Regions:
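Carbohydrate-recognition beta-sandwich/jelly-roll modules
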Residues: 1-302, 308, 325-327, 339, ...
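Active-site-proximal substrate-binding groove within the catalytic cores of carbohydrate-active enzymes
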Residues: 12-17, 157-159, 169-173, 177-216, ...
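Short, low-complexity, polar/charged sequence segments that are solvent-exposed and flexible
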Residues: 78-84, 105-108, 321-324, 366-370, ...
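Short acidic, gly/pro-rich beta-turn/loop elements at beta-sheet edges
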Residues: 96-98, 110, 313, 357-359, ...
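Short C-terminal domain-edge/linker segments immediately following a structured domain
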Residues: 116-122, 130-133, 333-336, 379-381, ...
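Aromatic-lined carbohydrate-binding/catalytic grooves of carbohydrate-active enzymes
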Residues: 246-400, 411-416, 422-434
Length: 615
């Protein structure tokens, strides 16, 4: 921490933070409680303030009263660190609410390119105040512990003065952002969600200012904080728990499917060409593909297999077993497993313990997520049609039930994929016989990952999230936001590897290898020191798995590109990403450094790269 002089002053609705010679303003008049039918501003409430001074620091506690219900805010500075702490505490506040917006956003209104905001949506986004595109909508409405924020924090830098704001109780918190087209401002702040309808407990945030700062400095502040809190578990530590971690590093990622069956009430159902709603590739065909890839010289490979259960991909979960009968049944799956084992390749199955399908043979509405209004949630979105969400408290039991059956058939699993857990928001359950908070949901999801570890199976999920990192080893991808949009769509900001600057040496991230009209995504895989897909079918493919001449040429090129990425990953997977930046202030020319040893330079205008060792 470089800044040594911080003072907090209150002026009416404003809180002023004097950091050395820099002034940061926060208008508390913008804070409010959102109820179902109205919005109540903090400055409309009866309140009183008191100064607090003790052995830790000093600050101001404000007690608010609304309809004879009281809550308090406490803003204080920790003397030993100069960290600013924000606490929101229910005293006698038992009212149900939708959200509490506190603290307010900082004033950040200069139309300057070097006034930037750092957003942790997916891998990371940088937004200059002058950025040409609007950014006002976040994934999952900004809810922490989802892909809206791989890490529950954000930061802002004006010239070389900056801060990072960290949520310390993220499971019931979210954030919002307002950046209009061409700026001139970016406002970002946190809000508090009810836990089973109520405020329930003290919510905590931490604000850390930094002088002469940059993107890397703020990320390293966060990394230090994560280490202090025990969130930081390296791949080397995970490898001591399961030696397959080292085996996965440098592997070619192969994503393939077996059975597709799209029911009529799914939004993906093709009414014009109904024959396209079903597809089948046998386990034998997939085994032949594995043989073919081995003949191509691939020495390390991980197969992620979709739709291996009899109902087909995204159908009947959690009752997706037995192995797909039409594709060869348990014997066919065992043959595929043996083929992978023969070549020392790794095998993992797609699995799902959130989407709870009405078509499941054991479906029970009493195990489905009950909403606050006591109704059972339902939707018809994915291939299997009408579904609810499974109460997460039951997920560990279903995971154990299903994996015990798979392993009993001597299927050689060294990794597996529990869909959406680290991507989608946390769930609550309002069933009066068994209430579940979001924090408990998070803990139950982690129990599922830990069970896999107990079977020497590496756990993965759709994306990555800090709350899962003690157990999660890898994921389907950990991409930049724009990579999941069409190449010609407007971007929300400049892609930056905020997550990898903190956690690169803690998790394995595969990267898409697409070549669009303007960019080669392989460059991002190199910049981030990740691993590569050698082939990846979509979630709802309609393919036959056959190789033709054109496919052979394409496959040869994909293998060549994979080897470039894998060679680097094997050198840097266990190293911290120690530096990142732009060359000549050009966002299209970026560099990263791993362990102060290896530097990667990419040019997204020329689609070129350079890897420098022993720097």
């Amino acid at each position: 921490m470089k800044s040594t002089r911080i003072k907090i002053k209150h002026f009416g609705n404003y809180i002023h933070f004097h950091v050395d010679e820099e002034l940061w303003k926060m208008n508390q008049g913008d804070c409010f409680i959102k109820f179902h039918d109205k919005k109540v501003l903090f400055n409309e409430l009866t309140s009183y303030q008191e100064m607090i001074q003790n052995g830790l620091g000093e600050g101001i506690r404000t007690t608010y009263t609304y309809e004879n219900q009281t809550f308090a805010t406490y803003v204080w500075i920790e003397n030993s660190t100069n960290h600013i702490h924000f606490e929101l505490t229910p005293l006698s506040f038992n009212l149900e609410f939708d959200a509490i917006f506190w603290p307010a956003a900082f004033e950040f209104d200069e139309c300057k390119e070097n006034w930037i905001t750092l957003v942790n949506q997916m891998q990371g986004i940088l937004i200059p105040n002058t950025f040409e595109n609007e950014f006002t909508k976040l994934n999952f409405n900004g809810q922490f512990c989802s892909i809206a924020a791989y890490m529950p924090s954000f930061g802002q830098i004006k010239e070389k003065e900056g801060y990072i704001m960290i949520s310390e109780t993220p499971w019931d918190m979210a954030y919002q952002i307002d950046h209009p087209t061409n700026g001139p401002y970016t406002h970002i702040s946190m809000r508090h969600l009810p836990s089973l309808g109520k405020l329930s407990y003290t919510r905590k945030m931490k604000l850390i200012f930094d002088h002469d700062t940059n993107i890397v400095s703020l990320c390293k502040i966060y990394r230090k904080d994560a280490l202090e809190k025990g969130k930081y578990v390296t791949l080397e530590e995970k490898a001591k728990r399961n030696k397959n971690v080292d085996k996965l590093i440098g592997s070619a990622f192969l994503h393939k499917g077996i059975k597709t069956h799209v029911v009529k009430d799914s939004i993906f159902y093709d009414h014009v060409n109904p024959e396209k709603n079903d597809a089948l590739i046998t386990f034998k065909q997939r085994a032949n593909e594995i043989q073919h890839l081995h003949d191509k010289g691939i020495k390390k490979l991980y197969l992620h297999l979709d739709g291996g259960g009899d109902p087909g991909y995204d159908n009947c979960h959690p009752d997706y077993l037995p192995a797909c009968i039409e594709a060869g049944g348990w014997e066919g799956l065992k043959e595929l497993s043996n083929t992978l084992k023969q070549y020392n390749y790794m095998f993992g199955l797609h699995d799902q313990y959130r989407d709870y399908y009405f078509s499941a043979s054991t479906f029970d509405k009493h195990q489905a997520i009950m909403m606050k209004n006591k109704e059972i949630f339902s939707q018809s979105l994915w291939a299997g049609g009408k579904q609810s969400f499974l109460c997460t408290s039951l997920a560990p039991y279903y995971v154990k039930r299903n994996f015990e059956e798979v392993l009993a058939h001597d299927i050689h699993l060294e990794a597996s994929y529990l869909d959406v857990f680290t991507c989608n928001e946390l769930d609550e359950w309002f069933n009066e016989h068994h209430l579940m908070t979001r924090k408990e949901c998070m803990e139950y999801r982690n129990q599922c990952f830990d069970y896999l570890h107990s079977k020497n199976i590496l756990p993965s999920s759709e994306e990555v999230n800090e709350w899962a990192l003690k157990s999660q080893v890898f994921c389907h991808y950990g991409p930049y936001d724009f990579m999941l949009r069409k190449p010609n769509e407007k971007r929300l900001g400049i892609p930056v590897p905020l997550f990898n600057l903190v956690y690169h040496d803690c998790v394995i991230l595969p990267w898409p290898m697409d070549i669009t009209e303007n960019e080669d995504y392989m460059l991002y895989a190199l910049l981030n020191g990740g691993c590569a897909y050698v082939d990846k079918d979509g979630a709802y493919p309609n393919v036959d798995g056959a190789f033709n001449d054109n496919r052979e040429k394409q496959l040869d090129e994909e293998i060549r590109r994979y080897r470039i990425v894998a060679d680097l990953q094997e050198k840097v997977a266990n190293l911290e990403m120690t530096d990142f930046g732009f060359i000549d202030q050009n966002y299209k020319k970026q560099y990263s450094v791993f362990g102060n040893q290896i530097k990667v330079i990419i040019d997204l205008e020329k689609n070129t790269y350079e890897i420098i060792t022993n720097i």
